[in-house]
């Protein structure tokens, strides 16, 4: 049996609709919050673009999904780089984890002809920090309150000893496409969305396992040098 995941439109749904989808065999339910804060949501997905979508309604349906689908079977899409701080988006990631869900993260990449095509793509240093921090919160037991942030809301300390952080960075999984859990490992998404949020020349979410040269580039973008091994 092939697992079925739902990307919903909460604006047109009531709680019973969520139950019907579960009863029909859906396995995972997701909501495209996209924006990390109510203000950004309203500006980019709600009244600011003459849309009926509302932050309150999206969260209402997301909470219905938590009740009906259960732990680890619901989540939310989040786009990084729409004007939020790193602290704000990672606080949202933590909120989802505390509810029992997951975040499926995208790097903002302006599409020609869209209402936001004049905005810059998310800087790679910002994206890599959020990618790494999100992975630590979702899969490594680190909490956002274990991390430190500077006055601009940027991650300055990931809340892990350098050696442990190096191991996670070198594994590369934190920088792969995030989404519904895959067949072989919970932290490797079943959905790889090749180049869905970046050009192939500057990969944001790797649809494949990053190799050594990719990890070196990621480290440069993070500005985190690998700790030299301690001699015995």
Located regions from the model:
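Alpha-helix-loop-beta-strand connector modules within alpha/beta enzyme cores
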Residues: 1-5, 50-72, 123-143
